[in-house]
Design a protein with these regions (language model features):
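Alpha-helical segment of the N-proximal tetratricopeptide repeat
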Residues: 56-89, 99, 103, 168, ...
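Structural signature of tandem alpha-helical TPR/SEL1-like repeats
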Residues: 70-78, 104-116, 138-150, 173-185, ...
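Canonical tetratricopeptide repeat
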Residues: 96, 130, 164-165, 199, ...
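Helix-start (N-cap) detector for alpha-helical repeat units in TPR-like alpha-solenoids
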Residues: 57, 91-92, 125-126, 158-161, ...
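Terminal, low-structured helical/coil segments at or just beyond the last alpha-helical repeat
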Residues: 42-48, 331-366
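Structural marker of alpha-solenoid helical repeat scaffolds
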Residues: 86, 120, 153-155, 188-189, ...
């Protein structure tokens, strides 16, 4: 399994950083529940979904649900286990147990109980979708696919988050065309359009399926040479792979058709800075900032470029601006420390470098 760009140095489960699985599970829970609640047409099958809103939950589950809402998942599970010990056949218990373990990010246990829930009621959309998500988050995309496909097949307008997860599962099982179909549905564009290839290329790049991402982006260019953001994506890919001349060429092509895109100027400046074309980097960074003064990245890169040019006062001003916008970015303070040291201001340098180290330790505890 290849690591993702976002989690290159973080242990991951199928492209999801381990430290993020709990929050992602909660996020997907919230949106899957909302998506199911918004559906108007019941699924086809032997029965309608048996999942009920918390307000109509059986009395025996009320305490467990209250504990869950308070974030006391272990206590909620213990409460459900006491019900299980008294009567393992209690209707709806398997779904309650599976949902509790899902929220706890204990996906093997969630799968165990959610399989029971779907066996008892194959048309229970909540149990089916949670089981699919549990398989995905637990690192079993192949098992997740048929369940998420089933949920999508039940409804004319499937939950967007489920469509995204389904597309990622297709990528992880190397079924790229099916992934494209899922993302086309997610973004409401034709399956064979340039946009569908662009969206799929973006998702492939995020998962670091670089050769396929490049292939799909090139297909998008073939279908629509003036489609915005295709050359930007290719530029990002080449920059990530340190193919700097190719990255520069792609960013320049993007600006020719999309001259108001601030991020392209920023990425082009990054590419210029890597080959020490600092004057050009400074010029396009100014354009990026003029177009979007709310992003810290261009200010940070401007500080680095100006420091390389020996313009330390201006570098400090750019970096201080970035620090004002985002005081908790350790990179900004580290660069400020370097700039102050270049200026001979040792006291200010030590203060910034110490703060950078503290922020780095706080954000990445070992």
């Amino acid at each position: 399994m290849q690591p993702t760009m976002e989690a290159k140095h973080i242990s991951s489960v199928w492209g999801i950083p381990v430290w993020r699985t709990a929050s992602l599970a909660a996020f997907l829970w919230a949106f899957s529940a909302r998506g199911l609640a918004q559906q108007q047409t019941p699924p086809e099958g032997p029965s309608t979904p048996s999942a009920k809103a918390p307000s109509s939950a059986p009395a025996e589950f009320a305490q467990a649900r209250k504990l869950t809402q308070q974030g006391k998942l272990d206590e909620a599970i213990a409460e459900l286990q006491s019900i299980e010990s008294r009567d393992p056949s209690t209707k709806g218990l398997a779904l309650e147990m599976g949902a509790a373990y899902y929220k706890k990010s204990d996906f093997p246990k969630a799968i165990e109980y959610l399989k029971k829930a779907t066996k008892a009621d194959p048309a229970n959309s909540e149990a089916t979708q949670l089981l699919g998500l549990s398989y995905y988050l637990g690192g079993h995309p192949a098992e997740a696919i048929p369940l998420l496909e089933k949920v999508q097949g039940w409804y004319s307008r499937a939950n967007v988050d489920a469509a995204y997860i389904l597309g990622i599962c297709y990528i992880q099982t190397k079924n790229y065309d099916q992934a494209r179909h899922a993302f086309a549905k997610m973004f409401d564009v034709p399956q064979d359009s340039a946009a569908s290839y662009l969206f799929t290329a973006r998702m492939l790049l995020r998962q670091e399926y670089d050769p396929v991402a490049e292939e799909y982006a090139r297909k998008a260019v073939t279908l629509d040479p003036k489609l915005p953001l295709v050359h930007f994506l290719l530029g990002e890919l080449y920059l990530f792979k340190s193919r700097v001349p190719e990255a520069i060429a792609e960013f320049q092509k993007e600006l020719a058709i999309n001259p108001g895109h601030a991020a392209t100027y920023y990425k082009l400046a990054d590419a210029y800075s890597r080959v020490q074309r600092f004057e050009e980097a400074e010029r396009v960074l100014q354009r990026s900032i003029w177009l979007d003064a709310t992003s810290t990245g261009p200010y940070i890169l401007m500080g680095k470029v100006l420091e390389k040019k020996g313009e330390f006062d201006l570098a400090v001003r750019a970096l201080q601006r970035a620090a004002t916008m985002d005081p908790n970015n350790p990179t900004t303070h580290h660069l400020l420390g370097q700039a102050f040291r270049d200026m001979g201001k040792e006291e200010e340098a030590e203060s910034e470098l110490k703060l950078a180290e503290e922020l780095q330790t706080k954000q990445n505890p070992r």
